[in-house]
Each structure stands twice: as C-alpha cells, then as structure tokens.
Curated annotation (Swiss-Prot):
Pfam name, any one: DEAD
Low complexity: bias regions: 103-119
Known EC number: 3.6.4.13
Motif Q motif per record, residues: 257-285
Biological source species: Pyricularia oryzae (strain 70-15 / ATCC MYA-4617 / FGSC 8958)
Cellular localization per UniProt: Cytoplasm; Nucleus
Family matches, as SUPFAM superfamilies: P-loop containing nucleoside triphosphate hydrolases
Biased composition (Basic and acidic residues): 32-67, 74-86, 135-147, 168-198
The gene coding this protein: PRP28
Name of the protein: Pre-mRNA-splicing ATP-dependent RNA helicase PRP28
GO cellular component, one term: cytoplasm
Amino acid sequence: MAPLDLEEILKKHKAAKAEAAKPRFIPRGQRKKMEEEKKLKVEEEQKRQQEELQKTRSELQKAREELAGLQRVRRQEQSRSRESDHSVPTGPRAMRSYDDDSFNGNGNGSNSNRNNNNNQRDRQDASTKTNGSRTAEEVQEEKKYLERYTGPPAKVSTFSANKKRRRTTDQKFNFDWDPKDDTSQPWRYEETGAHERSANGATEQVRRKKATRDYNDPRLVPWQDKELSQMTTRDWRLFKVNLEIVTKGNNIPNPMRFWEESNLPHVLKDTIKQVGYTEPTPVQRAAIPIALQCRDLIGISKTGSGKTAAFVLPMLSYIEPLPPLNEVTKTEGPYALILAPTRELATQIQAEVIKFATRMGFTVVCLIGNKRTIEEDAFALRNGAEIIVATPGRLVDCLERHLLVLSQCSYVVLDEADRMVDGGFEDSIHKILAALPPSNGKPDDRDAEDPNIMSKFLTPNLRYRQTVMYSATMPPSVERIAKNYLKHPAMVTIGTIGEAVDTVEQQAMWVVSEDERRNKLRAMLNTYGTGKLVIVFVNTKSNCDAVAKDLKSSSFSAVTLHGNKTQDQREAALQSFRDGRTNVLVATDVAARGLDIPDVSLVINFNMAGTIEVYTHRIGRTGRAGKEGMAITFCGPEDHGVLYHLKQIMSKSQMSKVPPWLKDHPEAQSKPTF
C-alpha cells in the first residue's frame, strides 16, 4: 500500500471545500421537494416530542398512584397497631388523681375530691411563694419572653395612640401657628433644626460608610495615579465614558492615557514635547492606538477636537520605516496622501505636518488651485515628495496631466470627508482612490484586523495601504465611500454627532430689517469684541464685502474671506487676522470648517446658516481646545426653516439659554417636514 500524500489530501480537501462553497442552481421541483421533506421532518420531530411528553406524564401519574397506595397501606398498618394495643385506659386527665375506691362505690369520693382540691391549693401557694421570691425585673423579663415566643395574650390590644399620632404627623407640614410662637419675627426653617433632624439618619449612614471604607481599595484610585498595568476593565470603561469615547469594531485596543505611553517613535514624542502638546485630546487618545495597529479607521468628532494630529502622527509613524526616495522611486509618487476640502484647510494641514515631518527628513508638498499654476506644481514635484496634501480638484488635474502617479502610496487620509462630498468632490474622490495601486490593497476579510499581517512589507517600498477617514457627520454618501474603500474599519465617535461645542455660549436675536442687523452688529462688537478676535459669517460674497466696508466706516479693522478672493489674498487676510493686526474677519462658509484660528473669542452669524450643520461648524470656530467662547446669531423671517433645530441645539447646551422669542415662536414648536 502506497504511503498517504499529505499535500494531495489537503489539495482534495481544499478543492472539495471550494466546490461546496460555490453557489449551485437548484431546480424549482427539487426546491419544492426539499421544502416538503423539511416540513415532514419538522412534523415528525413535533410528534416525537409530544409522544415523549405524554410518556413522561404517564410515568409521573403512575408514580403518584404508587405513592398514594403506599400511604394507604401505611395508614392501615398504623390503625391495626392501635387496635391491638390492650393497655389499661387511664381515663380523663382531670380524674386521674381520684382514688380507685371512689369508683368502686365505697362512698369516699367526696373525701378524694377534697384531697384533690387541697393538693391544688398547695401547688398554688407554692407557686405564689416562688413568684414572691423573684424580683419584678425577672417577672417582667419572663413576660417579655412569653410575648415574644407565644404572642400577646388573647383579647389584649397592642394599639398605641402616641405611636399613631407620631407616625401620622411626622411627614405633615403644620400650617398653623403655635400659641407660643413669636409671629413678629420672620420664620426660618434652619433655626427650627428640622433639617438636621430629617437628615440625621442619612448623615449617620454616610458617616458609617466612610468609616468602613477601605481607602487602599485600588478601585478608589483615579486612573491618572495608576500604572498602566494596574488599569482594570472597569477603569477603561469609566475612562471612555468620562471622555465620551465610543468605539466599534473587533480587536479595538485601549485608549492612550498619556503621550509617554504611546507606541509612537521617539522622534515624534520629542517633537510633541517641543510643540507644547501636554495632554492628548479624546480623539487623539482613542484614534492613535487604533491607527498604530495598521487598521483602517473612521473618526467622527466635533470640530476643534484635535483631529489633525490624530491622523498626522500615525501617518508619519507608518511611513517612517520606508526607504528614502531616490532618483528612481521619486517618480513613483508619494508615500502618504492627505485630501482636504478647501485650500485654507490644506494649507493649515501642511503647516501641521511640517512641524513633525521636518525632523524625520520628509518632504511635504501642498497642491491647491488658484495659488499657483499647474506648471509651478510640476516644478515643486520635480524632486519627489513623501507626503502630499491636496484638494481633490487640483490633485485630479495633476493625475490627468500625468504630473503625478500614486504607485507607492501606502497611507491615505480623507479629512472633512462630508465637507468634500457636500462641495461636489465625490466624483473626484472616486477617481483619486481608483488611481491607487491595487497591489497593496488590504484583503476584505478578518486579516485586515490583524496588525501582525497588516504591518508586513509587500516590497521594500510598499506596505499594505491604510485608509483613514475623518468627518463631523456620516451622511449616506460618505458611508458609500467608506464601504467601497475601507476594509473592516474601526470606528471612533467622540461626543454626540451634530451637537455644538460644550464650551460655547450661544445667543440668538430676532431682527427684522437689514439696518437693525447692522446696528446690532456694531453694538455687539463694541460690547464683546473690543480687543478680541471676532469672525462674522455672512451667506453671500457680495454681502461679505458690504458688511466689511460698513465696519471699516465705523472704525473697525476688518478683512474679508470668500471664494472670489485669490489664494494670495485669502492667505494674507488669514495671516493678518491670526497676527492680530486685524481683529474682525468677515467670511462666507469657506471658513466655517476646518480652519484652526486660536484665540477666537466671538463668532457672530450676521446671517443665520441655511442648515443647522453649517451653524454648528460656524460656532465651532470659537471655544476650541477647551477654551470658552461666545456665538451670537441674528435671525429673521427668512430663517423659519432652521428655528426648530436652533432651539433644540441651544437647549442641549449647558452654557446657553433659549430666548423667550425663540421658545414661543410658532416655527420652533415642531420639526419641519420639508
């Protein structure tokens, strides 16, 4: 007999498994026959179960009858044993002390009765003497024992009028004055001592609980004072609840508590200290450990939460092991790609990346339209770049003109994905992601969740492509992109989607005319905006220039930011505003999202946003990084469609108060149906 070939057996097994996994067509008649067989099996199984149940019931009934028969036999035997007992009857207990002669007719019955009575009197006298020799406390103690074990004597009431009166009046408030009360002085509840008496029991309970508390219990130690190895499952759960971190997915690592505990390279940790990042934000705590495991990631967080560093640091850590670009590899494109919806946000991200990438020797190139021509972009790419930050439109132009390829791109970031889709860049995103090399795509199975497999190098210059998406909301269009291009992603949600920043005080004012709107704007700037950075949002470009001109005529220093400005003009306006040379920035929604301008203390919505989502992002320009801010909104008759949502979002804020006009407005009472 020839020896078994293990490879042949495995090959046959694999072929059989693949054959079984293939879908096969089943004719209609065969399907009907299979359904009938399945139905017949179900009926047979039900019939078998009923028979077993009936059999069990009959056995129980038979056992019950046997037990009853045994009990009858036992009673009969006891009855026969009583009948066979021939002992002399003793008679009634009261007559046992009589002499036998009294029953024999000797006429001595009366003497016996007298003797019995005398004996009873003697016993009573002895009992009285015994009771007399005991103290009153002993007698009372005996009565208590008797009442405890035998109950109170018959026909003896246990009612206590004092107890009932105290029980019924304890919780009642006395509205009448006592004749002894001094009504000339104001009555003070604290002076009566009633609050002390009512809280006495609770205070004593708290005192006892504190006295018995074990202060060495590790559960009472805050997570900041614990070593990483001492953190329990309960500690991590409370940690995530306190920071409003919600994660979804398999094999999610625990969040990062401190920068020192992260697995980032030492060069990045040193740079973090130099730039002054003392403590990670919630999105950084949750997202960085997941991204460092080479997992695809979807991050949903409110504006101003530190999302840029949350994807920049893992990106640099991922491409650090790749070799430096040379004359050959520099033509293959970048190692990492970051897409942003606006030119301002792309420029801001480039500045953030340069902070950390310079010490690692990486080159960062920003591709945005309007600032420079396509030829200038080609010149910037002549020596290659490890990292490219771009807007979707300009990057598609570079790809179509063959100025750039993405043959070795291993890390892709989609920042503000919902904003890119809303801006009409969905087709551009699909074109860019389709231009990525399929050779380093992740498998669409559980291997995509295994960090050991995903961290492998496919070639010396190529790793599995990791895709990261950040957004403030998750509309269906963004979900489609995530479903098509992200493989088994982990999801991180910080706070509640669509809510405003908790550190912003919101105010809303009703205005009727344009003149009233301008007068209130000047009044708010004089009241709250003196010496502070203020952003004024308008809905149209023409109105943006008109409002800025009106403010300048009122001796306010103002600059404008809208889509008709060139890139140089927009950057100059932003730089002037950041430096404090101008304290009022009048802008359209182009500055509503993504821009991180520190120390903005006031946002004024000269025109209410068309949707509550845009409103949320507008007021998110202030109150960033834990600082407090204020947002003032002017509403008019044209804003009826968003009044309900504005009322809801203001009522959820602990720092804001819904004004009476908005609370009672008819359009704010029910959700609009359009």
